[in-house]
Amino acid sequence: GGGGYIGSHIVEKLVKKNINVFILDNLVTGFKRLVNKKATFIKGDIFNTTKVKMIIIKNNIDSIIHLAAYLDVSEAEKYKQKYNQNNIKGTLKLMEACKNSMVRNIIFSSSCSIYGNVIGSVNERKKPNPQGYYAYTKYKGEQIIKKYAKAYNYKYAILRYFNVAGASSSNKIGEIQKSHGHLIKNLAIQSLKKKPQVVIYGDNYDTKDGTCIRDYMHVSDLADIHLKSLDYINKKSKSLVLNCGYGKGYSVLDIV
């Protein structure tokens, strides 16, 4: 997933630290122009277990950052088989490829949506209660990671993202995926007069202005969390489950 929005920001920070990075991306939702030229790019996907295992062994790869997933919440409800195949079975295939190799650290891209409909703040000890199918696929992905970590002595960091926004200060990468649901990106486009209006969905939430409240995190900070988590599990030999947000929510109208 190194050719995607979040993945490209993580890679940018890794190569700045002179870490040898290999990107595996089928570019179905990623973009070749987001692929960092200082990393080794291999076009392919996680379903080709033989190819993935060969890449791991040939290059003595010891850490995997797994970002390959579909992430459209509405689409997931319509095309459950597609999301089951990619997000759940894809994770299973990747873990199979890691067996009996040099891999010792796994970073998994999860989601705060696994908690379900929560009022107020939530910590990592709260029992997951996924409501939608996308959330369910992320929850199952976490279970797969934990199962293989226990069986094959991996260390993992499961990172539960809240809402991600922003772009690298390098001005070379950013959020270019076509999406109707990314509020901050849509407002930026609208403010540049490239879009006639932004439609706000939902005005009857139990909030001060009736619109949904979300915790937004800058993508560069989220990328830093991946690097720090990798460093932690590598040095401490302990696994982690972390919420990734600032702990402060903003309503849709606040953002507007």
Label every PLM stretch briefly.
Residues 99, 147-151, 180-191:
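Basic phosphate/pyrophosphate-binding loop/patch that engages nucleotide-derived ligands
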